Amino acid sequence: MNLYLSLDLLPTALQENTFVYELYNGNNERISSGNFSDKREGDIITLAENEIVTSNVSIYTLYIYIDGNRDNPISMTNQNFRFNIYGEGTGAIYKENVIQNETTTPSNSSSTFLNTEVLRNQIESITIEKTNVVPNDAKYSKDISSKQDGSVMLWYTDKDNNSLYEISIGSENGSVEANTNGSGMFAYLDNVSTLDLSGLDTSNMTSMSKMFYNSKSLTNIDTSGFDTTKVVNMFGMFSGCTNLKSLDLSNFDTSNVTNMEGVFQNDTNLKEIKLGDNFKTNKVTTMLAMFASCSSLKRVDLSNFDTSNVTTMQSMFYKCENLELLDLSSFKTNKVTNMYCMFAYCTSLKTINLTFFDTSKVTTMQSMFLFCKSIEMLDLSTFTTDGATNIMYMFDTCSSLKSLDIRNASFSSVSKNTSAFNVVNSNVVVYVKNDTEKEFIINTIKNIISDNVIVG
């Protein structure tokens, strides 16, 4: 391989000086040396010809001295210069273009962005550029590459003079690669409304935890170029994006994700979520609060969900106040232990298919249907309460309920059952397991017609 040095920035005061260079391999052996003088900006120096022949990744060290040598260099102040090293041929120099990890996980909008001086609440736009050349009008720039080799640069401008910055992130070859841990990467961006991340390479990311968390002004996120095949953690990924109205995740491959807790939690204006065939959930173990407080969501297609490894569905649809229909017939719940508040405050929910639910391992169903005041029929004929210890407020204020099938459950034997049927319609028809359960229901639902409690 041939190795070259491009003099991208060389002030006049340095142009007459003699520069000495030495190139060492990973064994600290000098493989090339020389000098140059009387050079101008844009000139190219050949550092080595056919000296680097290894096909493996190796570390080389280049020393450059001005009018001196390795043992006796001189120093000059206030003279800025920039060299660019590049190679041609087999074994050419490879730069990863990977963004460095945050040294501190962001905790609020006053946290800094990607280890720079910029605060997250000072940003109004973020653009992925196809170059790492910092423009002259940049107010600030920093090398944010993981290897600190200049392959990924961040800079900002303030073109409208509003003290909010336009952030640019660019790499040498036009592709910016995210690090494996993207936790909080674009979180707490109070003043950013649109994010086009089509130029961000996410193919090596394993964590997208809280990636866009509490970016309250976001109305659009372009994730069409995201490669999520290696991602394991999506905890709170879009949580708190309160102005987000739609999300197209049809390109997401989530076949390795284990944590989907709170992915869309508190996205109060989210009306549409598009999930493609590769949005797999077969490895997911927690869906706690996954859609909680998505209060504008009317429908969501979960027909491809495989929940066979999920252990908690606590508050999964909590306060989805506009949700009208839920078909969960594909859900496998044989490992679920917690259904606390799963559908609580789904006040518009009229139809729900739970006919394939296996609740044999569920210990708490407390407030499961609390304030589902629009639902008229609940077929829970597959529900058992063998492991249940808490059904408090389970059907509290299901005031429109006309038919309830609980023929395989033994609610009377559950120790914590306070207000389980509080404010339930007294005209409801209830299908129960035996006479013991019938008596329990008659004594529990105020003013219920005894003939409406049917055994078998």
Predicted features along the sequence, with ranges:
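Negatively charged
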Residues: 94-456
